[in-house]
Amino acid sequence: MSSLDKRKTQNRSKKNSYSICLKEKASAELKREELARIIFDGLYEFVGLLDAQGNVLEVNQAALNGAGVTLEEIRGKPFWKARWWQISKESVANQKRLVEAASSGEFVRCDIEILGKSGGREVIAVDFSLLPIRDEQENIVFLLAEGRNITDKKKAEAMLALKNHELEQLVERIRKLDNAKSDFFAKVSHELRTPLSLILGPLETIMEAESGRGSPYWKKFEVIQRNAMTLLKQVNTLLDLAKMDAQQMGLSYRRADLSQLTRVISSNFDGIAQQKSITLDAELPPHLIAEVDCEKYERIILNLLSNAFKFTPDGGLIRCHLSLSQPAHALITVSDSGPGIPQNLRKEIFERFHQLNQEGQQANQGTGLGLSIVKEFVELHHGTISVSDAPGGGALFQVKLPLNAPEGAYVANNAMSRSDNPQTVNPDEYLLPIPTAGSGAELPQFQSDQPRVLIVEDNPDMRCFIRDCLSTDYQVYVAPDGAKALELMCSAPPDLLITDLMMPVMSGDTLVHKVREKNEFAHIPIMVLSAKPDEKLRVKLLSESVQDYLLKPFSAHELRARVSNLISMKIAGDALRKELSDQSNDIALLTHRLIKSRHRLQQSNIALTASEARWKAVYENSAAGIVLTDTENRILNANPAFQRITGYTEKDLAQLSMEQLTPPNERTQMKQRLARLLQSGGAEYSVECSYLCKNGSTIWANASVSLMSPRVDEPQVILQIIDDITEKKQAQETLNQLQQELVQVSRSATMGEFAAYIAHEINQPLSAIMTNANAGTRWIGNEPPNIMEAKEALARIIRDSDRAADIIRMVRSFLKRQGPVLKPIDLKALVADTTLILKAPSQSNGVSLNVIAGDTLPAIMGDAVQIQQLVINLAMNSIEAMSQVGCETRQLALSFSSNASNDALIICVKDTGPGIPEDQIGQLFNAFYTTKKEGLGMGLAICLTIAEVHNGKIWAESPPAGGACFFVSIPVS
């Protein structure tokens, strides 16, 4: 017979082809050829071999099954006439063209549809190729056809294209919605500016006409003006955002003195700094001329300073420095002594609508747009902004702006801006109101019997407004957040709690929840005042915990009316509860107990009835057998499933005991387990055992046995649940047999790979035997014969023949077909044989082999041949990995030792190869998983099977220094 010796052609220009030479196959290769055929037919994908004219020679079994044909039907016939291509005439003609192209020497590869599933009735898509194979004279002698099923891939690609199209449509829709939102903001902002102008203008006229701060209405005018200015600032911000989103925001460059601008802006915060005892340090040079948009520069400084004042505690320090930075940039730094900004939030604070939630700060006020506007204004100037830790703690903002406008930009010569006039800059737009005296969390001295009202509101202006509305008729005290309110309520419970929802430290809904958890506050009515139009939350709070919910803005008259109703209901409820508590508590208590006892009895009867119904349903319909026995193991009842499993009828089982259904060799153990169960008083146990059926067969089962709690005056009953696992046991035995056959096949394949090395190892002692035999003949033929030299030659012949015999013994033992034989293993002999096998392949691949075995190795039970196969597989993997890369030093270390507790053998195979990627370590031992270009990916899976047969473990590691380590742990006897 002939075989193909495949090797790459010497002519490098002939890509995607192989050279072959024909030779006579030795009979020793028959078995290997059979194994190769098994592997060929076992391939899942399409593989076929054609002659040079495209006629079928060989096709693997998976491809034949897919088309519903046999090899005999198509062998010797044109490949394009086979069942796979009979989709249409075009498919047949196309395949014929592909075969002709490959026959002319062209490598063909394309995606194509074939009849390759359900016996040729279903079309699948395959990645198809035809590879020309040449002989040593460059003549094409074979065509290798290969195909990989890519139907799922094609479907996934089509689905991905559809999803991408849907995503593009969604992105376009979002873009349109975003543009519509920006247009809406711009239009609404324009519409709001008109009524705000009509509020602020007349208000300013009225305040000028009043007699200064001595007027009784002056404070109310200030509140109106301050909040109107705040609203105007938010409107302007929204308008700026709309312009920036529409890319319509431009810069009006002017030559300005940044020192003067910054000095004027910072001076407007002097009054606020004095109120809060904050030191404002403005370190500015005499002059620093730059070309900037003065209005936007002012907004940058105002936002940074107001942000610093928000988070700086009373008595703190704020620094505002301006300096020249090279090349040609101005550097503005604003730092504070507040809590600072965590590292992980420093990018987020410049995002729109992001607010920094710091404990104790009013995080819920504002829109979260200030720093976003600052960043966008800075970037419009082609500058940068960053945040870091201030030297003494707190936050440090650094803004770097170029001194000169971009080339070609128009720059006005006048350096004036509206910020040059201190009267036009209003920092109140950017700061939270400063709490006035008496507006904090204080417990007043209650002087009368008027109802008490606790107001919880974080905005000082709103807090003062509500207090002024109610202080005439009620004793009012206030708190800025939920935590302070709880403290005040514990000291002086109110008759009514009025709370906002969005507050720092503790929100209003959290406060409501905590108040309702305390029994002493159960009868206190709660009113929510909120600007949050959340209908779902409003309904939830009204249905569960609060008595009223009023949306801002509201009128003072409506507030007084609602408060009056709640206070009246509270007073009436208190009076009624006091009256009821004076009635006969003994009768009420007795009635309550009787009702409760009757209710418990009814519930017990209902539960008992339901439990019995559920038990009956489980008993009759369970797939597992259920048996009730007495303490002597006599069968009292058996459900239909147990009758079906054993083949006995209910009448038959009533005459039997579980002991009679148990095989004789298991009865003693069964009696002992039952005795321990009765002695322990109910400790359930589970066991795998077997039972005798009526037809004489034996079944395997998992049995769970426990004691049932007996009713009064009833005997003890034992519950046994029998789960039939006979089919599972048979499947496991079949699986074990298949695994052993796979191990044997792998062992033969491994020895096939070693054939050349083994031949070399045997040839060496045989050559030495021939040499020494010739020498001995000459010594004996001398006159006189040289007996001493002849004896030494004979001794060397004996030594070399022993060496060859050892190799042959090792090979026969390794290839011996038998199941695993567990017996004590001679580890020293195993190590010696393994070293002998690995010596030749290590040397031929330039690998330094180092085998280390401890002096005292643990005694283990196992199959020595399988353990040796496991180690050889791991070692050959390492040798192959190192030979495929350019390692400077190729070292393979095998170590055999005990673990720390001396109860297991640890085998370590370590190499200096390329190592194993972390994402592949978890998949290495899966069947058919491989990182090689060739191979089935079964080697490491077989190693895992061998380790598990010996109750051991195998795992891989990739050390930081490089290479790979495989560990095997086999427990002692």
UniProtKB/Swiss-Prot annotation:
One of its GO terms (cellular component) is cytoplasm. Residues 32-103, 611-681 form the PAS domain. Keywords: ATP-binding, Cytoplasm, Kinase, Nucleotide-binding, Phosphoprotein, Repeat, Transferase, Two-component regulatory system. The modification Phosphohistidine is found at H190, H760. SMART domains: HATPase_c, HisKA, PAC, PAS, REC. Residues 452-567 form the Response regulatory domain. Activity is regulated by agonists and antagonists. Binding of agonists such as toluene or benzene to TmoS stimulates autophosphorylation. Toluene causes the most pronounced increase, followed by benzene, chlorobenzene and ethylbenzene. Activity is inhibited by antagonists such as o-xylene, o-chlorotoluene and trimethylbenzene isomers, which bind to TmoS but do not stimulate autophosphorylation. It comes from the Bacteria. InterPro entries: CheY-like_superfamily, HATPase_C_sf, His_kinase_dom, HisK_dim/P_dom, HisK_dim/P_sf, PAC, PAS, PAS-assoc_C. Its EC number is 2.7.13.3. It is an enzyme of class 2 (transferase). Autophosphorylated. Activation requires a sequential transfer of a phosphate group from a His in the primary transmitter domain, to an Asp in the receiver domain and to a His in the secondary transmitter domain. It holds the Pfam family PAS_4. Its main location: cytoplasm. The modification 4-aspartylphosphate is found at D500. Residues 108-162, 685-737 form the PAC domain. Residues 187-405, 757-973 form the Histidine kinase domain. One of its GO terms (molecular function) is phosphorelay sensor kinase activity. CDD domains: HATPase_TmoS-FixL-DctS-like, HisKA, PAS, REC. It is found in: Cytoplasm. It catalyses: ATP + protein L-histidine = ADP + protein N-phospho-L-histidine. Member of the two-component regulatory system TmoS/TmoT involved in the regulation of toluene degradation. Probably phosphorylates TmoT via a four-step phosphorelay in response to toluene. Can also be induced by benzene and ethylbenzene. This is Sensor histidine kinase TmoS. It comes from Ectopseudomonas mendocina (Pseudomonas mendocina). The gene is tmoS.
